[in-house]
């Protein structure tokens, strides 16, 4: 996206960015969890592109790889992964593990070494300290988390943040998996900001890869194309 800002994909993320700004105009969303019902649905790519899009509006953005089982962000941004979120969680919540990237205003905190107890670390009081610390440093923090059908990590973090953005992929995510993920978020009292449908218009032959819609807890859906 950063290398082709005029592409349909870039435009889709700009629309997603705008939609998120209108989710709660009186109380701006400052911490977002991205997840998906299952693996292979593109949640890490969506997290990275959304972070880039937000940074392009002169916001200070931190992208955190909170997938402590199968980390991806260090690969997407070609960064070392010797230290990262796990370093904050097991050592010092205030140490500097942010890495600058080519996008002005955006920094990335990679996962760091994969720990034996990811869920316990993410559910700890130290994670709350890390969240508060990062919130003071950035206008918005995006947390890339594991798929919801695999482990509970996304649910744990979703209940601690301002909202969750769920990513599904057309032709991959089953209706049952999507409903199950939504129920998990509802049970944990996580706020659902919306759903990004990956590959939607691309498969329909229109050249854009993403479609965004928001639904409320009342089950009423208001669709807006990106």
Question: At which residue positions do the language-model features occur?
Answer:
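P-loop NTP-binding module
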Residues: 1-226
